[in-house]
Amino acid sequence: MNQQPLVSGDWDKVEKKKGFFRSFLRDYGKVFGGNAFLLVGNMLVFVIALCVVMLFVPMVFPVFLPDKLKEYILDTGLVEKSLVTDESVNNIYYLMCMIASFALCGLGLVTNGPFCSAISYYFKNVLIGENDFKPDIKKGLKDNWKRSIGASLISLVVTIVLIYNIGFYQSGAMWSGMAATAAKSFFFCLLSFWCCMQLFVYPLIACVELSFKDVYKNAALMAVQNFPIAILVFLIQLILFIALPFTLVFQFGSTGYALMVIFYLLFSFGFIAYISMYLTWKAIQKILNNSL
């Protein structure tokens, strides 16, 4: 692999942009291109994410089953019983599964690793002002595809295991009461922290010469050292990929659906990838400064 060496002088170029939002506004056109690239990449793993949603998410959220969803809609009393047909419920169910699948991709839990590391490499060069889209993407794919595929598989397996454990303890199959609640909360916290770690994994793969083990070790350390910001970004991810899409679709109908698609096409994935690279640079700069 031939990643560019990380030196403190590179960060000086980033700092001249005077903050994240000014940097993002200046680079939005490039972020838009990166968003399109990531959207294509995520389409390739969307089927995998959809399988995870259909097989494991109902263990945590039973409404992700058509019959349970129908019961929930009827219990709310907000819709006349005559309107709650199997066809309408199935349409809502598949829409929910679609949004949840994109959410797994947006949270970095089910990803196309080579595409994520390639766009991280490109965004790093965008931040230092030495970017060229096609060569950067090509180099990012060529240099890091093996480790990135490994990271994708690890993320998928860990995500499934954590979701399964949350659902298992929620069902009360082994424990009940406070013990089950504590176990479920523990695995939920692990899943949340795993999401925070994913913010740093692909930028580290793309930009630093580290062993596979050290990538995850440093991602965990960076998530801890930058915990308040990482949690803030995690909350932004939840808003962009869960709260906002569900609100738009179920409150504003076809107009909301169109707005959701626009967010996916123009903004959501690229914005999070850009934040991810920016956070990693700041974390690396802290390490460089402490080593001086």
Where are these regions (language model features)?
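Membrane-helix boundary elements
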Residues: 163-201
